[in-house]
Design a protein with these regions (language model features):
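Metal-dependent de-N-acetylase/amidase catalytic core
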Residues: 1-130
Length: 130
């Protein structure tokens, strides 16, 4: 189950998070999704959505009540930033989640698509500094 984090900026989202967590009990694992601009959110799961970002953008633009053009711009910036945290190149996008292990779910990687590959970053350092 994917829900808002308990520390979300919006009181309705915090309330929903609490009720979803209570309802899930010990039956279902929870993933917390990121707030719009990642405020106070520390993810531990990164999912490559590059292949699906155009579909996501089309869906956002259909959500007329949320100022979709402005919203889409913020989402695009955030998804690019999260991909950059994995050193992804070019037109890469990532969505992030936080999983907090709770009994009996200590590892749910088997349920998720593979995470974004982390590309190494090399920097030439003058030998005099080594």
């Amino acid at each position: 189950i994917i829900t808002h984090p308990p520390e979300d900026y919006h009181s309705d989202h915090r309330s929903l998070s609490h009720h979803v967590k209570s309802s899930a009990g010990f039956k279902y694992p929870l993933l917390f999704c990121e707030t719009l601009m990642g405020v106070n959110f520390n993810p531990n799961i990164y999912i490559d959505i590059s292949e699906y970002f155009k579909d996501k953008a089309k869906a956002i633009l259909k959500h007329k009540s949320q100022n979709p053009v402005k919203f889409l711009n913020a989402v695009e910036i955030n998804n690019k930033f999260r991909a950059a945290q994995c050193n992804a190149g070019g037109q890469s996008y990532a969505e992030v989640f936080r999983f907090e292990p709770t009994f009996p779910f200590v590892d749910l990687r088997y349920l998720l698509p593979s995470t974004m590959p982390i590309r190494p970053y090399y920097k030439n350092i003058p030998s005099s500094l080594i």
